[in-house]
From Swiss-Prot:
Subunit structure: NDH-1 is composed of 14 different subunits. Subunits NuoB, C, D, E, F, and G constitute the peripheral sector of the complex.
Topology relative to the membrane: Peripheral membrane protein
SUPFAM superfamilies attached to this UniProt entry: HydB/Nqo4-like
Gene: nuoD2
Record protein name field: NADH-quinone oxidoreductase subunit D 2
Species, as recorded: Chloroflexus aurantiacus (strain ATCC 29366 / DSM 635 / J-10-fl)
Length: 411
């Protein structure tokens, strides 16, 4: 005869509280959570609603991009870089292209250099608009989300005009650009520049002095400059602590040393300062785009790809007239070029911080190794430092303020 099933009472299950003793609990936040979108899991240790520790668990969006690039020719690998930081694909294209160009020691035409700067700064604005809209939405400010995506739509229209794609553009090539800018490119950019400064003013009117925004961001997620440097923070997250470090100024590339712009910095290293820094960065990017647009207009038509025929294919007109040029074009795209044995490292200022690319060549048409220094991966490691002692409700705002893109974290 079986024993009867007995159900324990709540008093038997719950251990009575002991005076002076507290216990922490471990909970999962994500990956199935509105703020993590299925791609990030946070293991939280909580004392009530107070965060004791945070352990990010990544890998939910792993794509193996770095390994896949080893099986592609150098030029074909460009398309894979779009998929890392998918909110700033042009920055990924540029970093990889600069590293391979350094390996090849090729010169880039001035028109291509200016176009690269112009488009990556538009990309920076676009990325910051996504951050601003989603960050505000996480804190229940839906109007800002709608307004920010209104301007982002204009930028994506410009990318579509240039490359035919709104996000995965693959427009930059090793040696220059895929093809020249369209004739209506400059007028379209100028239309955007005419309205963008006033739009940024609108965002600030809605948020900068908003009491609810201030309550959720001022003094929350604080990190000092010394800790930020020790943890490897870069980009707006570092500059919000008062450190005026920007690769575009410290180690200029693509002619950035010839442009006039400032490095916005914060003081307190909290969520609010990270917000103010990114807003100011959008204004500086508008300033750079204006200068680049003027230079393109003054420069006029010209080549947008290197004249080195070991790297770049012959012009289209030659392919239709010369069998040798047709064969050259075919072999260059099917077999690829062969850089000399060696390695090269290049870092740029992406919207999320320092993006680095390390390329190793063994003399074959395919890279022996490609490694990216992804700023989002490093910035995420600071989450525990900033979250300790804060309420669980602050975590959503804190994650958003770091602006991570899990595509480059799990590359």
């Amino acid at each position: 005869m079986t024993e009867p099933i007995t159900v324990p009472t709540p008093q038997q299950i719950i251990e009575p509280a002991v005076a002076g003793r507290t216990e922490t609990m471990v909970l999962n936040m994500g990956p199935h959570h509105p703020s993590t979108h299925g791609v990030l899991r946070l293991v939280l240790e909580l004392d009530g609603e107070v965060v004791v520790n945070v352990a990010p668990d990544v890998g939910y969006l792993h794509t193996g991009i770095e390994k896949t690039m080893e099986s592609k020719t150098y030029q074909k690998a460009v398309v894979l870089t779009d998929r890392m930081d998918y909110l700033a694909p042009l920055s990924n294209n540029l970093c990889y292209a600069l590293a391979v160009e350094k390996l090849l020691d090729v010169e880039i035409p001035e028109r291509a250099q200016i176009a690269r700067v112009l488009l990556t700064e538009l990309q920076r604005i676009s990325s910051h608009l996504v951050w601003l809209g989603t960050h505000a939405l996480d804190l229940a400010a839906m109007s800002v989300f709608l307004y920010a995506f209104r301007e982002r739509e204009q930028i994506l229209d410009i990318f579509e005009l240039v490359s035919g794609a709104r996000m995965m553009t693959s427009y930059f090539r090793i040696g220059g650009l895929a093809y020249d800018l369209p004739s209506d490119f400059i007028p379209t950019v100028e239309q955007f520049l005419a309205v963008m400064p006033s739009r940024i003013d609108e965002y600030e009117d809605l948020l900068t002095a908003n009491p609810l925004w201030l309550e959720r961001t001022v003094g929350v997620g604080v990190i000092d400059a010394q800790s930020a440097i020790a943890l490897g923070l870069t980009g707006a997250n570092l500059r919000a602590t008062g450190v005026a470090y920007d690769v575009r100024k410290a180690m200029p590339y693509s002619g950035y040393e010839t442009y006039s712009f400032e490095i916005p910095v914060g003081k307190n290293g909290d969520i609010y300062d990270r917000y103010r820094v990114r807003i100011a960065e959008m204004r500086q990017s508008v300033k750079i785009v204006q200068q680049a647009t003027e230079r393109l207009r003054e420069l006029g038509p010209g080549p947008v790809v290197t004249s080195n025929r070991k790297v770049a294919p012959p012009p289209k007109r030659e392919i239709t007239e010369s069998m040798e040029s047709l064969i050259h074009h075919f072999k260059l795209w099917t077999e690829g070029f062969k850089p000399p044995r060696g390695d090269a490292y290049v870092s740029i200022e992406s919207p999320r911080g320092i993006l680095g690319c390390y390329v190793v060549s063994d003399g074959s048409p395919k890279p022996w190794r490609v490694h990216f220094r992804a700023p989002s991966f490093i910035n995420l490691q600071s989450l525990a430092h900033m979250a300790k002692g804060r309420m669980v409700a602050d975590l959503v705002a804190l994650i958003a303020s770091l602006d991570p893109v899990l595509g480059e974290v799990d590359r």
